[in-house]
A protein has these predicted regions:
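Solvent-exposed interaction surfaces and binding hotspots enriched for charged
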Residues: 2-248
């Protein structure tokens, strides 16, 4: 895939940013995503997923190609973060409604977010990030990782120095942290997602479909199960991240 000069400049800026690192309740649940979706709705989600894939391929491509570990790290980070941001956006449209997110404050002053609505989009519904990604990994012959162990690790490290530091498959290192990926790529990718999707409850689905597409094109160079492990090691902690930590 070739890029024009503007894309090349933007891609170079993104790589430089990642290498440098970062700069200095009881409300009702979000309605479950139904098993039936309209053709028009899915068309928008699919268009959004294609934009995610196209843009990331351009931004991440170097002379050596697209590093697949980084690709899945970015996709997982954005997918997880989109679950929380989708809930926030949905409830911002409702008068006097607080998002159903449970706030956890640590001794060092950091804030993290948990809750059933978050888990539903991330791992429990038919169209959750996990459901879409794991089912496709199995279809391609991969073995999904132990998701409960990933959740347990994130909960155990919440507030500590190991929070948001993924444990990647052996031989599959990813250079940057998930929070760096969110900080760098969210503002570049999310506008297209919002443009095509029918609402915030579909954002995470678009990222899930983009993860499926990435598995399809990379299955010859990375086992789909390993790709899925990278995705979820990034997605779970980023779903709980305080948006203020990335300037939102």
């Amino acid at each position: 895939m070739r890029t024009d000069s503007a894309d090349a400049s933007k891609a170079a800026a993104v790589r430089q940013t990642l290498s440098a690192g970062p700069a200095s309740s009881g409300a009702a649940r979000v309605p479950a995503i139904g098993t039936q979706r309209t053709c028009a709705s899915m068309a928008g989600v699919k268009a959004a997923s294609k934009e995610i894939s196209r843009t990331l391929m351009k931004l991440l491509k170097s002379r050596q190609g697209v590093p697949v570990e980084t690709l899945f790290g970015v996709l997982g980070s954005l997918a997880g973060f989109s679950c929380q941001m989708g809930i926030r956006d949905e409830y911002s449209r409702r008068a006097n409604a607080l998002p159903p997110l449970h706030v956890v404050r640590t001794l060092d002053g950091r804030v993290f977010y948990f809750g059933d609505a978050l888990n539903e989009m991330l791992a429990e519904s038919q169209y959750s990030v996990w459901s879409l990604s794991a089912s496709h990994a199995r279809k391609l012959g991969g073995t999904p990782p132990d998701l409960s162990a990933i959740f347990a690790h994130v909960s155990r490290t919440c507030g500590g120095t190991d929070f948001g530091v993924p444990r990647f498959p052996e031989g599959r290192p990813v250079k940057d942290l998930p929070v760096d990926y969110v900080r760098t790529f969210w503002s570049l990718i999310q506008p297209a997602v919002q443009k095509h999707c029918n609402g915030p409850s579909e954002w995470h689905i678009a990222y899930g479909l983009a993860i499926q597409a990435a598995m399809d094109v990379s299955k010859a160079v990375i086992d789909p199960g390993a790709a899925l492990e990278i995705v979820m090691e990034c997605a779970v902690p980023m779903s709980k991240l305080d948006p203020r930590e990335v300037g939102l």
